[in-house]
Amino acid sequence: MSKFFSLSLVAVVVAGGLTLYWRWPAAVPEAQPATTVAVPSRQSLIEQASTSPAKAPAEAQPSIAVTLPSLAGTEVDGQLRTDAAGNLLLDLAVRDYFDYFLSAVDHSGLDAVIEALLADAGRRLPEPALGQMISLLGDYLDYKRASMALMQQPLDARQQVEPQAQLQALQSAFARLDELRRAHFSATAQEALFGAEQAYARYTLDSLAVQQRDDLGEAQRTQLLEQLRERLPDALRESEQRQQLAQEQLQRSEQLWRDGADEQQVREFLAMTYDPDTVQRLLDEQRRERDWQQHYQAYRNELASLQGRGLSEADGEQLQRQLRERLFSSEDRHRVETYDAIAAKQPEPLDP
């Protein structure tokens, strides 16, 4: 069991790492065929802006909720600011502002999103900042268009189950994204929009590489990881340290469950660090995870008994698909497939 879950943990870490990069657009549901989003070019964006009233009265402009219903009831994320000379200030808040509107693409379409974004920005920014924002948005959309092909490339069979291959795939994706960003943005804009993300992504990949080295003792590995952590910007380092402490607390609480502790004992342990609402949320999450693992193990047991009937490979694969569809929701099946792929590479069966 431990070997299986150690590998599955790597898969989860890798999947989590990918979310550092993939922020556009929302995933296409399984039941729908994948389609290509037509991202407008910088020139067409400028033309669209020039045909829209830049400073129409507020009452003449439809609200964001009307134009983009999926954003109803939400606050505009990010911020558009100017310096004393009226120039656009570049920081992560500008990217957050873009992404807030772009999150509605799947629901409302890109044309409506761009129209709403330009109308909102026109009420917030004077010139020359407005023109600078439009130019930057054009670069951002061009970058998104160029990066979509990279995002859509699936992992091959080896990359799905081998940690070293997964790490190499992530390193390659990171390098290619970095090249795309350098090609589409000035050095100043790249640092402002992606600097923190790139620093943490580089730290994550370097940490995974250290963890996979078998020529290091535990003390050497700990020292190298600490050196990597020290290179992070202060804010990221403090955040990472908080995450590490939280992860250690959760691991200790999970060990309590494995050692036979009851819920009250785990609650008391977590209460030494977290407030009551957070303790309850963590207990609920751990309970759901234990239930899911038990459900998955029951599925594996039923699958093993069915596969013991001497079915052909094709019949066995069809039976496995049918069993997944019967026992798991569509949201859970990707996780089941990942676990199954890992289990298929293990020489020993999973412990019940």
UniProtKB/Swiss-Prot annotation:
GO molecular function, one term: unfolded protein binding
Topology in membrane: Single-pass membrane protein
Record GO biological process: lipid catabolic process; protein folding
Keyword Cell membrane assigned: yes
Family: Belongs to the lipase chaperone family.
HAMAP family for the chain: Lipase_chap (MF_00790)
Protein name: Lipase chaperone
Gene of this entry: lifO
